[in-house]
């Protein structure tokens, strides 16, 4: 069958969403399906990816303040869909492309939307008080869920806002991790020594530097550890609109900003070379960067407010409250545990999340 994947907020530096779409598309092709990915771009382009996916880039304006994200006009998407004639429609955008479920139903195309974010959490952080945010999110989610045949949530955390409205068409399908690229064997002791700059422990934060990720908590964690006498260095890999503010916050602390790492191999080498990874974002609905760290044999300290509390288990990391002292205490506890045991536990947990399993689940949801 011909599966068309739709997404805005997809670009060269878009992290987890891009990774998920690429692996799912590759898996669909490997399962014998034709796959077309439609995303925003600077100009119109059609290209065949090495995975066998055909990618359409549609002209789209940049969204101010997002660090380069683009959102294509839904009218352009609908015009392309009419030409592509999909057998199944998979949408990875609940906001700017929320009307695509209606298009699919009118045209007799079975449709699925993947919930990559918690709408109630985002509204509460950026726009509205808690109760009002939930009320607005519930109304929007009812309309959205009713317009698609299936809503896919990757975790219980992501599912919670649909449980609250008793949406009947929700399925749980976890995402996966590339266990070949992200592996303990990628550890580079020489590079680790260079990055650590004399510190006893190398801590890494890998991800987009945007407000909802709360990268400042990683910086503050290192401040807590340094004040307690620990010899640590934090390496932040990623870029985004918060970078300048974070650099100011980190002034005088053992923090290095690497910027965006384009190669997945380079990211894998960094994660495997670290002693601990931090994932302080409280709104993560899955957290691929944290899972990639686990696959690399590196334990992770995560926000207990996020979906990552479902993924990280004792021994391979810790889920803690959203303040720096809790993160610092968890880091200390992990560093005090035997390295070989904690690294083996991290890898073992990641091995429970293989992309082929996720692909099978998504294909079952597509029908």
Regions found by a protein language model. Name each.
Residues 244-261, 265:
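Nucleotide-activated donor-binding/catalytic signature segment of Leloir-type glycosyltransferases, i.e.
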Residues 194-223:
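Conserved donor-binding/catalytic core segment of Leloir-type glycosyltransferases
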Residues 41, 157, 176:
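Carbohydrate-associated surface elements
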Residues 299-302:
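Short hydrophobic beta-strand element within catalytic cores of glycosyltransferases
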Residues 119, 133-150:
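Membrane-proximal helix-turn-helix segments that form the acceptor-binding/catalytic region
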Residues 282:
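Aromatic "clamp/platform" in nucleotide-sugar-dependent glycosyltransferases that forms part
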Residues 145, 260, 269-274:
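Short alpha-helical donor nucleotide-sugar binding micro-motif in glycosyltransferases
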Residues 257, 314-325, 332-338:
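Conserved acidic donor-binding segment of nucleotide-sugar-dependent glycosyltransferases
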């Amino acid at each position: 069958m011909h599966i068309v994947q739709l997404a805005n907020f997809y670009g060269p530096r878009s992290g987890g969403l891009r990774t998920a779409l690429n692996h799912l598309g590759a898996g669909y092709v490997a399962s014998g399906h034709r796959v077309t990915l439609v995303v925003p771009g600077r100009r119109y382009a059609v290209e065949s990816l090495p995975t066998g996916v055909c990618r359409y880039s549609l002209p789209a304006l940049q969204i101010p303040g997002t660090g380069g994200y683009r959102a294509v006009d839904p009218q352009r998407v609908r015009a392309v869909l009419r030409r592509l004639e999909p057998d199944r429609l998979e949408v990875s955008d609940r906001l700017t492309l929320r009307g695509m479920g209606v298009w699919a139903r009118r045209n007799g195309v079975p449709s699925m939307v993947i919930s990559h974010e918690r709408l109630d959490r985002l509204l509460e952080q950026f726009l509205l008080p808690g109760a009002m945010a939930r009320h607005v999110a519930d109304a929007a989610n009812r309309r959205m869920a009713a317009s698609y045949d299936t809503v896919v949530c990757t975790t219980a955390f992501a599912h919670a806002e649909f449980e609250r409205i008793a949406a009947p068409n929700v399925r749980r399908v976890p995402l996966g991790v590339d266990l070949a690229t992200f592996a303990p064997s990628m550890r580079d002791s020489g590079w680790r020594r260079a990055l650590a700059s004399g510190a006893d422990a190398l801590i890494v934060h890998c991800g987009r530097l945007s407000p909802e990720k709360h990268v400042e908590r990683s910086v503050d964690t290192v401040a807590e550890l340094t004040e307690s006498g620990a010899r640590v260095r934090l390496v932040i890999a990623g870029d985004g609109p918060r970078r300048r503010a974070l650099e100011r916050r980190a002034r005088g602390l053992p923090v290095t900003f690497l910027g965006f790492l384009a190669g997945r191999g380079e990211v894998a080498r960094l994660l495997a070379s670290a002693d601990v990874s931090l994932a302080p974002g409280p709104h993560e609905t899955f957290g691929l960067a944290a899972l990639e760290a686990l696959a690399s044999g590196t334990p992770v300290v995560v926000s207990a407010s996020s979906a990552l509390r479902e993924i990280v288990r004792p021994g391979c990391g810790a889920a803690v409250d959203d303040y720096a002292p809790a993160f610092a205490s968890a880091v200390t506890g992990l560093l005090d545990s035997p390295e070989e045991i904690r690294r083996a536990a991290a890898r073992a947990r990641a091995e429970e999340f293989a992309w082929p399993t996720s692909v099978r689940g998504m294909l079952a949801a597509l029908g």
